[in-house]
């Protein structure tokens, strides 16, 4: 029948098969709608099942011809064909995305990243704590502690200046000197206050107890005379050094009138007076008197019979 004409399409006229030069849009559309939508089936050599009654060889030849014609279409010179081909290739994808969706997704991801970065930079960054150098602490507790130590050092320096010959650098030794000096001042204040209140006898006993408790009695006249000269010299040069020396010897300064009252109250039956001083002597007391220009005298009361004169 028509098998020969189908096998040789170039010799027989066919309304559907034309040369590439006379290819029109109707044939192209007919080929598109009659073929499968998958691109892989277009490139496959096996012909798809159709309801056409034409032989397989004829269809295969027709399909090869159509593929050749499709590849020979100049897409750059025919804009309607370009649009149609683009629509075919895009529509044939089963999971295609609309045009511009990739760009929109990329733009959205960039916007999200920029927003995240901007939020991170907007947060205030905590500066690392710089460790202060030694002596320059910035912590309030450390500053208060440093100020407290400075005040203690200043008070210790002022207290050291009040103590005669308080040149100790060790705090413990300096505090020992301060304690001894304060005890000496307490003894002197007690003696002077008792003389003012008229308790000469009690003052004499208090002096004997306090001064003789920690020091040995001076029994030799030579040692007493040396003490007198040393105290007189110190009182002329440095009163503070003299007070410290007296403290070490268990002596204290008191007015001559107080010494006279103490001696009279201790032994009222016998009241011999020391020449040029008017201080009575008692056989039970060892009295050392050193007069100075201020009208005061140095008196020590101890249980010893020796008496010395300036």
Curated annotation (Swiss-Prot):
One of its GO terms (molecular function) is protein dimerization activity. Residues 150-185 are annotated as: Helix-loop-helix motif. Disruption phenotype: No visible phenotype under normal growth conditions. The triple mutant lrl1, lrl2 and lrl3 exhibit very short root hairs. The double mutant drop1 and drop2 fail to develop sperm cells. Residues 1-23, 95-143, 203-225 are annotated as: Disordered. It is found in: Nucleus. Induction: Repressed by heat treatment. Residues 136-185 form the bHLH domain. Residues 136-149 are annotated as: Basic motif. The keyword tRNA processing does not apply. GO terms for biological process: microgametogenesis; pollen sperm cell differentiation; regulation of DNA-templated transcription; root hair cell development; root hair cell differentiation; root hair elongation. Keywords: DNA-binding, Nucleus, Transcription, Transcription regulation. Expressed constitutively in roots, leaves, stems, and flowers. The keyword Nucleotide-binding does not apply. Residues 1-20, 104-126 have a biased composition (Low complexity). InterPro entries: bHLH_dom, HLH_DNA-bd_sf, IND-like. Homodimer. This is Transcription factor LRL2. It comes from Arabidopsis thaliana (Mouse-ear cress).
């Amino acid at each position: 029948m028509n098998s020969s004409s189908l096998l040789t399409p170039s010799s027989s006229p066919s309304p559907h098969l034309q040369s590439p030069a006379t290819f029109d849009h109707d044939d192209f559309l007919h080929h598109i709608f009659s073929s499968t939508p998958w691109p892989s089936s277009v490139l496959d050599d096996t012909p798809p099942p159709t309801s056409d009654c034409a032989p397989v060889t004829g269809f295969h030849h027709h399909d090869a011809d159509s593929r050749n014609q499709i590849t020979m279409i100049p897409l750059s010179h025919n804009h309607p064909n370009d649009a149609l081909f683009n629509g075919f290739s895009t529509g044939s994808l089963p999971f295609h995305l609309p045009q511009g969706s990739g760009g929109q997704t990329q733009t959205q991801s960039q916007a999200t990243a920029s927003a995240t970065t901007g939020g991170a930079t907007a947060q205030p960054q905590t500066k690392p704590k710089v460790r202060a150098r030694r002596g320059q602490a910035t912590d309030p507790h450390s500053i208060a502690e440093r100020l407290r130590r400075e005040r203690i050092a200043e008070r210790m320096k002022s207290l050291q200046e009040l103590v005669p010959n308080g040149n100790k650098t060790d705090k413990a030794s300096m505090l020992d000197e301060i304690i001894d000096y304060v005890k000496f001042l307490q003894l002197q204040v007690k003696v002077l206050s008792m003389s003012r209140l008229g308790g000469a006898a009690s003052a004499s006993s208090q002096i004997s107890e306090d001064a003789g408790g920690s020091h040995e009695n001076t029994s030799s006249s030579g040692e007493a005379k040396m003490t007198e000269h040393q105290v007189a010299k110190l009182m002329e040069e440095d009163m503070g050094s003299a007070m410290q020396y007296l403290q070490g010897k268990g002596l204290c300064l008191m007015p001559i009138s107080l010494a006279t009252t103490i001696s009279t109250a201790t032994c009222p039956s016998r009241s011999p007076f020391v020449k040029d001083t008017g201080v009575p002597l008692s056989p039970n007391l060892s009295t050392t008197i050193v007069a100075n220009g201020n009208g005061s005298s140095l008196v020590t009361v101890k249980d010893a019979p020796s008496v010395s004169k300036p």
